[in-house]
């Protein structure tokens, strides 16, 4: 009887002596990066040549330090993650996994792909679409990893490219562990991939941080106590209270889902113009010589999401609220030596900007005030002094508690946005792989492959650029709720967001 025999502990593949072993950089080996597997996808209303895309990515991962993106992921004896970079890539150990499906039908005849969101009706108001997870069968192959262990105990490469072709469109799926890269790292990879695709290898930037972690020298330059939010650090009993509230949230409302949200360009532009006007009038009434606060579309979108989320949840006005905005470190003067211009750092390089407020302020004050607070806190917290102090605090807290620092009271409600607009994912240019455009009804089959490629009045995006981008993923060990990414702005000027809530709240969101 073996009823009580435990499963044997999984074992990694045998070490390959010729592999180069490189420990993961500090921000790459964190609890949340280990927990998240991302599946990014793009719909192109053109027929793309999968082999051209595959061969360009394959060539990129043979160039200099870019080879590191094909490294195998392993645990060392101390429990830390490390890369094992093959001395050479072969058919048995490729730099990435590639799968393709040729459906032979129009995208409008495919039971899943035809539901990929579009603003086909020209809506001028926000619209909710289904969860991107519903497209999983289209985005990645069954062999694609969904958790870190799927890499640790196999010899699978880090990147998985899955391409589905139709007679008039193409869907490109791209999967990876968050330990490999963040959103802006994905953007830099995208640009280098396009350069190779277009025959511009000379434009592929040098790979930054192959061996050494460029961020590590900056850590501990400034004492953690100098961080502007240090006195609001969540710890001790406050942190235990925060965890208890999170547990109760998932006990009472165990089901959650994400929705893709369309925010029409004119709608967001009107909200922003009204906010700027409100702030200008407020500034004039204050009789100071300071300029009126600036707010971006991203600030407006986060403020709008916060208000809609609190309304949908029926949040008590007295509830403290933490608005967390993911902060990209590339380009910050505090890390000028870490990220020299012209070089590509692909790994994780993000912290967070935090706005501490209340549900009452978000629900009852004009949108302009919340957006201005988000912008003000971002500007303060990304100064060189605060970035250096936050990095020092981050490492101190990870070493002492095993988690990233959080700020605010224990009974707070936390909302988090990652703005991917700077990644320009809607501007990804695969035109060099385009065989035929598929904008016309019935177009895009083999007989049309020699027709001229051109943008027509029925489409806004240029040839070889996506009409939609989206993301889904697998969360292991924790769940992301009241959070998500702003996917960016499409060629029509419309904004797209993926947002996660408890299921019961979606009926009251809009």
Language model feature labels by segment:
Residues 1-221, 273, 297-317, 416-420, ...:
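Non-catalytic N-terminal regions of enzymes
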Residues 65, 283-338:
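Hydrophobic "lid/gating" helix adjacent to the active-site nucleophile
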Residues 150-153, 251-252, 405-407:
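Short Gly/Pro-enriched turn/cap motifs at secondary-structure boundaries
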Residues 279-286, 344-453:
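Helical lid/core segments from catalytic subdomains that handle acyl or acyl-like groups
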Residues 241-244, 375, 379-382, 386-393, ...:
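Eukaryotic cytosolic low-complexity regulatory segments
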Residues 225-292:
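Flexible, P/S/T/G-rich "lid" or insertion loops adjacent to the active sites of thioester-utilizing
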Residues 71-91, 325-333, 391-418:
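Short, structured protein-protein interaction patches enriched in aromatics and acidic/basic residues
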Residues 33-42, 80-119, 252-258, 329-373:
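Acyl/amide activation-and-transfer machinery of modular secondary-metabolite enzymes
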């Amino acid at each position: 009887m073996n009823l009580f025999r435990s499963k044997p502990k999984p074992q990694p593949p045998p070490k390959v002596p010729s592999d180069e072993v490189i420990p993961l950089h500090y921000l790459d080996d964190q609890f949340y990066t280990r927990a998240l597997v991302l599946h990014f996808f793009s719909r192109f209303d053109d027929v793309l040549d999968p082999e051209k895309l595959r061969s360009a990515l394959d060539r990129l991962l043979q160039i200099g330090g870019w080879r590191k993106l094909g490294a195998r992921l392993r645990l060392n004896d101390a429990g830390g993650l490390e890369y094992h970079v093959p001395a050479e890539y072969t058919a048995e150990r490729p730099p990435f996994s590639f799968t393709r499906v040729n459906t032979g039908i129009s995208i409008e005849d495919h039971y899943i792909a035809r539901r990929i969101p579009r603003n086909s009706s020209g809506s001028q108001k926000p619209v909710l679409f289904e969860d991107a997870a519903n497209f999983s069968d289209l985005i990645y192959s069954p062999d694609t990893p969904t958790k870190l262990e799927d890499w640790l105990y196999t010899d699978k490469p880090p990147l998985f490219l899955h391409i589905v072709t139709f007679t008039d469109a193409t869907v490109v799926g791209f999967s990876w562990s968050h330990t490999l890269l963040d959103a802006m790292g994905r953007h830099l990879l995208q640009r280098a991939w396009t350069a190779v695709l277009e025959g511009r290898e000379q434009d592929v930037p040098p790979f930054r941080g192959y061996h050494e972690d460029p961020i590590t020298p900056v850590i501990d330059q400034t004492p953690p106590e100098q961080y502007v939010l240090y006195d609001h650090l969540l710890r001790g009993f406050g942190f235990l209270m925060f965890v208890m509230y999170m547990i109760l949230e998932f006990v009472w409302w165990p089901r959650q889902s994400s929705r893709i949200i369309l925010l029409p360009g004119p709608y967001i532009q009107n909200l922003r113009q009204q906010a700027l006007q409100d702030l200008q009038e407020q500034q004039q009434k204050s009789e100071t010589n300071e300029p009126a606060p600036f707010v971006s579309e991203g600030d407006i979108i986060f403020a709008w999401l916060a208000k809609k989320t609190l309304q949908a949840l029926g949040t008590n006005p007295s509830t403290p609220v933490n608005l967390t905005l993911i902060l990209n470190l590339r380009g910050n003067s505090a890390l000028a030596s870490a990220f020299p211009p012209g070089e590509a750092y692909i790994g994780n390089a993000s912290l967070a900007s935090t706005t501490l407020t209340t549900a009452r302020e978000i629900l009852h004050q004009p949108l302009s005030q919340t957006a201005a607070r988000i912008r003000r806190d971002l500007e303060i917290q990304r100064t060189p002094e605060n970035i250096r102090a936050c990095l020092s605090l981050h490492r101190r807290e990870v070493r002492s508690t095993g988690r990233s620092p959080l700020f605010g009271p224990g009974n707070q409600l936390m909302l988090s946005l990652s703005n991917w607009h700077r990644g320009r994912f809607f501007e990804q240019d695969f035109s060099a792989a385009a065989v035929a455009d598929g904008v016309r009804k019935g177009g895009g089959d083999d007989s049309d492959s020699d027709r001229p490629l051109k943008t027509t009045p029925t489409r806004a995006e240029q040839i070889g650029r996506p009409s939609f981008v989206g993301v889904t993923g697998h969360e292991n060990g924790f769940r992301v709720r009241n959070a998500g990414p702003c996917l960016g702005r499409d060629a029509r000027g419309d904004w797209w967001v993926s947002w996660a809530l408890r299921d019961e709240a979606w009926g009251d969101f809009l």
